[in-house]
Amino acid sequence: MQVLKGHFDIVRFLVQIDDLRFASAGDDGLVLIWNVETGDCLLELRCHTQQITAMTSYSFIRGRNAHAALITASSDRTLSLWDPDSGNRVQNISDLQSSVKCLLVLVRLDVWLSGGNELCVWNRDFELQCKTVHHSDAGISAMVELPKNFIAAAMDKEIVIFKLSLSGSDIVVMAMRHLADHQDTIHSLISINDGLFASGSHIGELIIWDSVDWTIQAYEHILWEEPAGDSQSEVKLKQIERSIQHMSSDGEYIVAAVGSGLYVFNVLMKSVVAYRKMAHDSNVLHTMLQEDGRLMSCSEDGSVRLWELQDLPLPAEPASSGFFGMFGTFGRSGKQTGPPAKKMPEIPGLRSLELIGDLIGHSGAVQMFLSFKEKGLVTCSTDHLLIIWKDGELQSQLRSLAVFQKLEENQKL
């Protein structure tokens, strides 16, 4: 592993720029660009006076060449466009009405969106095309692109469907539908595939939506335990334990970070595939599905863990019946009076989620990670550090291969 130093506060964001470069940003307002192979800090981008609240990258063709761009937003109510090749700040917007919480690039329309207390649509040259104002303290916290020029945006307990209407060079944005099926704040909003997207709330509600007609296709209310008492503190604790902090999908499965646990759902079968109620010692903050039935997670406990879906040889740990309700919870309505169930309900396709790797290196909560596949894995943390993790065996094989290739080239000469 390689420890990268350069930040002076919590590092919250990692964004891939290309096959070799990535950007990091956080509460110190700095944006640093790194080479994943060497660990070198290539550029230091200084502009924002307060913490970074959102960051994204995109590529575009100018002339015949491909170019990369980086957009950053800060709680100082500014937006900046950067050239990651030169480190120059190409554009800067400083008269925003509120801080931007999320960014979304629409490559097909050649525009990008910023979400906060208002939804703004910008062209590539940072010119404001249109905006819609919302008088909400929560504002827009997440956005996903939908077919036919629609956008889904999470606003507190609601998902608002916006339509982008194009007329010549003019763009107009308008709210078309308010989806108010969640009972608590939406923490995660992701695209699953061209036809589906998903949302997860603070009290464990996972809803899968149709991307075209915005109807509910599946509903999971994750309830593995009833509140142990009637006090407000105990109820609040249980809500935190089942809060969906993050979700990711490969189009076929969804992995949800629920409290300190992990839950994997089969989208087509509309059923749970595997789960770990205590996957970490504290809240899971970020997840990622990999190939071959593997997934990764990182947590406030400072660890990054690698998991594998395996066939279930023995009955899994018991769970409340409420967890397995597809269209609502069912089963217990009050406190459990008898001993806990010891037999797992018969669920077709249920598998176990087995720990196969544990990366320990950070002294603070791991906020997120970024995979460069064989080149390595990058993590960032509240300890102000980044770490590049590499597969030692794979790196040895790659070095050996490079040596053999060099020998062959020399022999040909």
Task: For every predicted segment, state its role.
Residues 9, 28-32, 50-53, 76-80, ...:
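Short coil/turn segments within WD40 beta-propeller repeats
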Residues 4-5, 45-46, 93-95, 132-135, ...:
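Surface loop/turn motifs at the tips and blade-to-blade linkers of beta-strand repeat domains
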Residues 36-38, 84-87, 124-127, 165-167, ...:
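Short loop/turn segments that connect beta-strands within beta-propeller blades
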Residues 22-26, 70-74, 111-115, 151-154, ...:
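Conserved beta-strand element within WD40/beta-propeller blades
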Residues 64, 88-93, 97-172, 184-187, ...:
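Solenoidal tandem-repeat scaffolds enriched in leucines and small polar residues
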Residues 8-15, 50-62, 98-105, 137-144, ...:
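Canonical WD40 repeat/beta-propeller blade segments in eukaryotic WD-repeat proteins
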